[in-house]
Amino acid sequence: MEHLVQVSERTWLDSEAFELTCTRPQRFTFVAGQHVRLSYDGLVREYTIVSGTDESMLRFLIKRVPGSGLSARLAETAIGTSLNLGEPTGYLTFQSSDKISVFIASGVGVAPFVAMARSGVQGFILIQGARNYSGLFYRPLLEGAALTWVGCVSRPTDERQADSIFHGRVTDYVCDHLSPGNYDFYLCGSRPMIHDMTHLLDERYPNARVYSEAYS
């Protein structure tokens, strides 16, 4: 089943990524962490919802990819434009557990964890990776919800922030700094990150449950 929604707002988070806000259809429900198919003018793409489950609007974290794809169109389309919205799907959703939940994200892969935080999930460890400081999206929200928030920047450009941010990849941080523990891991990001992190966790935490989702 498809729904018709309208673009109501676009907020740029840095030079490449923006949050797109759309109307929410009546009786449209989803679980924090799920994604939907958006389509416009023959272009189709899956995007993770970053709204809280009880919010009146639907929000999406989108990275603009230069060219003729959907993200480039959504970066410029007029407020009020109608989009087609598919039904929610995906299984990277929060599972209640007596273990400590560790969320690990790279880039816009932080999206499902934003939705979880906006839906009331708290007390997790979040290891958030980006190329530079501006790519650590939603930091105030996530720091407030997390037990521990760690920002990892692989290509730092501002040494003044060196004291509060880890310089390196999320895999480097987990390898060198994540203490032994009883964890559930949730991974979202690029396929290379998911591959490398899964291999690392299998070695370091063989009894841990690992939930993952890669974006293309």
Where are these regions (language model features)?
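FNR/FR-type flavoprotein reductase catalytic core
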Residues: G69-S216
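Ferredoxin-reductase
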Residues: E2-I79, S154-R155
